[in-house]
Curated annotation (Swiss-Prot):
One annotated GO molecular function: calcium ion binding
Phylogenetic lineage: Eukaryota, Metazoa, Chordata, Craniata, Vertebrata
Protein name: Parvalbumin beta
N-acetylalanine: residues bearing it: A2
Task of the protein: In muscle, parvalbumin is thought to be involved in relaxation after contraction. It binds two calcium ions.
Length: 109
């Protein structure tokens, strides 16, 4: 698991179980359930780097669609509606992607 150095496996499993059904993903509930919302700034930066698959310095829509799979192989992809809602929630400057500061604000929010 890519997040082994940051998150506990049991918390990740519980968070993923909470959004198994299509359309049930809620980023606030997920971040709280997996324990990310209580992590340090450095740990949040590590999480961002894992999710930023292309290392562009931003999390784009395609990376958000596969967001859950970063936590556990075989997890479902987010639906288009979930992906767009997630992007809208995190993209505070309207550039169509989520930067590290936006990601940190979303986790702590």
């Amino acid at each position: 698991m890519a997040f082994a150095s940051v998150l506990k496996d049991a918390e990740v499993t519980a968070a993923l179980d909470g959004c198994k059904a299509a359309g049930s993903f809620d980023h606030k509930k997920f971040f709280k359930a997996c324990g990310l919302s209580g992590k340090s700034t450095d740990e949040v930066k590590k999480a961002f780097a894992i999710i930023d698959q292309d290392k562009s310095g931003f999390i784009e829509e395609e990376e958000l669609k596969l967001f859950l799979q970063n936590f556990k192989a075989g997890a479902r992809a987010l639906s288009d509606a979930e992906t767009k809602a997630f992007l809208k929630a995190g993209d505070s400057d309207g550039d169509g992607k989520i930067g590290i500061d936006e990601f940190a604000a979303m986790i702590k929010g």
